[in-house]
């Protein structure tokens, strides 16, 4: 089965999750949610890629899901290092390092595993426009880390909403899972 994401209106983690959930039964969604709760993601803030990877390695989930999560956070760490002009091991995670963000990323990885598509395609990505408040203060949309990830070959569409419609984490998820972009 080919899974096709429509990101023309939103490319947030919520949009990704909703589109994945539409392919699953309520029982499958409940099983994913239970797996997230049982996985053991701590609620504290993870400051760097080493802390995130240690948490991922300890999760009670299939190895494929851990591999997906490590790849997504590696994409994020490389983007942060590029934006801040520092070495990978000196990147500092702000919003993407909190426990809720890691749980949300885990949930999407588990949803992808439950859908089990042979191939994933997507439309160009809606980023939105305007400003967003984050740990670094008020920033343009897309945020620098988001823009860095999108610049690696993820096509975007004309911004059409004054909001952050693609975050660094959702851009990294898209970068990892989507194999082809088409309208």
Outline where the language-model segments fall.
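Conserved phosphate/anionic-ligand binding catalytic regions in large, soluble enzymes, centered on
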Residues: 4-18, 93-116
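General beta-strand structural signal in soluble alpha/beta enzymes
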Residues: 5-7, 88-95, 121-124, 158-159
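Acidic, glycine-rich active-site loops and adjacent beta-strand->loop/helix elements
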Residues: 7-11, 35-36, 97, 124-133
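Glycine-rich nucleotide/cofactor/substrate-binding loop typically near the N-terminus or early
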Residues: 9-86, 143-146, 151-156, 160-171, ...
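Flexible, glycine/proline-enriched loop segments at strand-loop-helix junctions
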Residues: 62-66, 92-99, 130-137, 157-165
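Active-site histidine-anchored catalytic micro-motif
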Residues: 101-108, 119-153
């Amino acid at each position: 089965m080919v899974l096709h994401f429509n990101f023309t209106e939103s490319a947030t983690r919520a949009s990704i999750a909703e589109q994945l959930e539409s392919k699953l039964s309520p029982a499958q969604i409940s099983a994913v949610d239970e797996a997230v709760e049982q996985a053991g993601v701590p609620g504290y803030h993870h400051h760097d890629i080493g802390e995130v990877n240690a948490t991922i390695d300890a999760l009670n989930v299939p190895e494929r899901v851990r591999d997906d999560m490590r790849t997504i956070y590696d994409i994020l760490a490389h983007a942060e290092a590029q934006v801040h002009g520092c070495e990978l091991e000196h990147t500092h995670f702000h919003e993407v390092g909190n426990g809720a963000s890691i749980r949300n990323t885990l949930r999407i990885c588990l949803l992808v595993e439950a859908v089990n598509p042979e191939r994933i395609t997507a439309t160009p990505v809606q980023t939105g426009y305007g400003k967003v408040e984050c740990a670094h203060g008020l920033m343009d949309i897309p945020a620098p880390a988001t823009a860095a990830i999108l610049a690696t070959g993820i096509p975007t569409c004309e911004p059409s909403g004054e909001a952050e419609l693609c975050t660094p984490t959702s851009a990294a998820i898209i970068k990892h899972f989507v194999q082809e972009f088409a309208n």
